C-alpha cells in the first residue's frame, strides 16, 4: 500500500510536468508569433525603402526644374541693393551670427546659391558670391556637403584669402562698446568648420540647414519683413513731422 506522502509527491511531479509542457507550448507559440511579426516588419521596411527611392526620384526631377528658376531669381535679386544683407538681418537666427564687421562685408554680397548634387541624396553646396571688396580676394566662398551611405558627412569649404590687414584673427572680432575686450565670433568662421561629422552622433550644421531649408526657398519673405519695418518707421517720422507743422501753424 502506497503511503499518502508518496501519492502527494507523485501528484506534484505530474503537475510540474504538465506546467512545464504547457510553458513550452506557450514559448513555442510566442517564438512563432515574433518570427511572423519580424517577417512583416521586413516587408514593411522593403516597402518604405521603395517609397524613399520614389520620393528621391521626384525630388531629383523637381530640383532640376527649379534650378533655372532660381537662377532667374538671382539675376533679379542682384538689382536690389543690400538684398541679402537685409534678408540675413531680418532672419531671427541668422541675424545673431553677423558681427558689425560681418555686416560691412555683407554689403558686398551679390548672391547666395544652394545647389543640390546631381543625386540629391548625396549632398549639396552653398555658395556666397561677393563683388570686389576691401576684405578678401575671393569672388566666391563655397561650402560643400557630401553624404556617405554610412551616415558620415564630408565637408569642404573655401579657404578665405584675406587681404593684408583684414584677416579676422581666429575668426573672432573684438566687440565694441565694452570696457572688457569681449570677443564675438564672425560668421565667416563657418567656412573653417570642415571636420568630418556623423549624423548618427546627432551632429548637424545648423547654419547650413537654416540657409538651405529656410532662407533659400523664399528670401523675399525676410527681406520684406525688414522693408515693412523701415516703411513703418518712415510713416511714424512723417506723422510726427506733420503734427509738428500743424502745431507751428496753430501758434502763428
Curated annotation (Swiss-Prot):
Q: List the disulfide bonds.
A: none
Q: What is its main location?
A: nucleus
Q: Which domain of life is it from?
A: Eukaryota
Protein keywords: Chaperone, Coiled coil, Cytoplasm, Nucleus
Q: Which GO MF term does the entry hold, naming one? A: chromatin binding
GO BP annotations, alphabetical order? double-strand break repair via homologous recombination; nucleosome assembly
Q: Which InterPro entries match?
A: NAP-like_sf (IPR037231), NAP_family (IPR002164)
Name the residue ranges with Acidic residues bias: 226-252
Feature: compositional bias, Basic and acidic residues? 1-15
- Role description: Acts as a histone H2A/H2B chaperone in nucleosome assembly.
Q: What is known of its domains?
A: The acidic domain is probably involved in the interaction with histones.
Q: Which family is it part of?
A: Belongs to the nucleosome assembly protein (NAP) family.
Would you tell me the protein name for this molecule? NAP1-related protein 2
Q: Which organism is it from?
A: Oryza sativa subsp. japonica
Amino acid at each position: 500500500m502506497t503511503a499518502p506522502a508518496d501519492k502527494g509527491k507523485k501528484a506534484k511531479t505530474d503537475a510540474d510536468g504538465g506546467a512545464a509542457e504547457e510553458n513550452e507550448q506557450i514559448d513555442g507559440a510566442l517564438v512563432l508569433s515574433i518570427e511572423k511579426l519580424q517577417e512583416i516588419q521586413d516587408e514593411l521596411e522593403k516597402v518604405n525603402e521603395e517609397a524613399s527611392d520614389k520620393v528621391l526620384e521626384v525630388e531629383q526631377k523637381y530640383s532640376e526644374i527649379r534650378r533655372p528658376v532660381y537662377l532667374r531669381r538671382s539675376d533679379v535679386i542682384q538689382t536690389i541693393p543690400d538684398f541679402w544683407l537685409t534678408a540675413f538681418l531680418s532672419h531671427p537666427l541668422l541675424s545673431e551670427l553677423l558681427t558689425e564687421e560681418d555686416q560691412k562685408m555683407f554689403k558686398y554680397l551679390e548672391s547666395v546659391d544652394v545647389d543640390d548634387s546631381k543625386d540629391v541624396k548625396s549632398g549639396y553646396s552653398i555658395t556666397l558670391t561677393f563683388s570686389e571688396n576691401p576684405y578678401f580676394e575671393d569672388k566666391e566662398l563655397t561650402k560643400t556637403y557630401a553624404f556617405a551611405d554610412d551616415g558620415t558627412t564630408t565637408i569642404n569649404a573655401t579657404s578665405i584669402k584675406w587681404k593684408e590687414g583684414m584677416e579676422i584673427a581666429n575668426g573672432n572680432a573684438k566687440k565694441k562698446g565694452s570696457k572688457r575686450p569681449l570677443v564675438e565670433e564672425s560668421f565667416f568662421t563657418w567656412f573653417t568648420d570642415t571636420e568630418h561629422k556623423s549624423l548618427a552622433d546627432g551632429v548637424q550644421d545648423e547654419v547650413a540647414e537654416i540657409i538651405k531649408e529656410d532662407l533659400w526657398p523664399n528670401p523675399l519673405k525676410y527681406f520684406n519683413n525688414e522693408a515693412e519695418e523701415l516703411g513703418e518707421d518712415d510713416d511714424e517720422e512723417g506723422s510726427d513731422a506733420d503734427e509738428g507743422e500743424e502745431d507751428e501753424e496753430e501758434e502763428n
